[in-house]
Structure formats: structure tokens, C-alpha cells
Amino acid sequence: KKYYQANKEKLAEYQRERRKTDSLFKMKRYLSNRTSMAFKKKGYKKNSKTEKMLGISYEKVKKHIGRQFQNGMTWSNYGEWHIDHIIPLSSAKTEAELLKLCHYRNLQPLWAADNMSKGAKIPQVQIQIKL
């Protein structure tokens, strides 16, 4: 923690540069940050690693997302599209629900404009998430 405090700007720059060239790293950081924010907003403590909550390795999550790409989506243009939680994390009513919504089967790639217009709406067709 002391090292982080003393080198905050240097570490932030390193992460910024790495996210530009390493799509797996960018995806990991996004999912970890998004999950942490969701738990904080709901007043819960995140007790597990994000990868454990996803239910599979980050590498497999990346493949899962890639298999759902729409025409024109690539890992090179990640940013023009987002990783979307099909059922928004904000819709969770309990900590157990929030944990289930973190599962990889609740993730899909969505064009940025479509994701922004979707917002926190729950789609008509819901998915079953098995843990």
C-alpha cells in the first residue's frame, strides 16, 4: 500500500499504456473495477476475487465474449463496443443476487451507443445463470 501511495501516478500511467496494447488486461481491469463499484454502491463488501465470481478464467471470459461479437467487433476496437451486463448489476436486490449477476454468462459485447441507450434496463428475455 505504501508503494502504491508513493507511485500512484507512475502506476496509473503504466496501466493506461498497458490497456492500450493488452486487451486481456483491459478486460480484467474493467470487470474488476465494475464489480468493485457495484458492491460498494450497494453497501456490500467484495469478499472474492472477480475471476472467482465470473465462474471461469479471464482467458475463457475473453473467448466467451469473442464468440458473441457482432459484425465489425474485434479486440482491437474494444472501446467502440462495451462489455455489457445483460441484467444490470444495479438491478440486484440482495448481495446473493449481485454475486449471481457477476457470472460470465451475464456478459455480452454491445456497441457503445447501444449500451448507453440500454442503460440499466433489464431485457425482456432474461438468462438463467447457473453457478
Where are these regions (language model features)?
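Contiguous alpha-helical segments
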Residues: 1-82, 128-131
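Short, solvent-exposed loop/helix junctions and linker helices
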Residues: 55, 101-104
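Intrinsic disorder/low-complexity detector
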Residues: 5-9, 24, 87, 108, ...
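Charge-enriched, short contiguous segments at helix-coil
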Residues: 95-101
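Histidine-centered catalytic micro-motifs used for acid/base chemistry in nuclease
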Residues: 63-95, 106-113
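Short Cys/His-centered divalent metal-binding micro-motifs
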Residues: 103-130
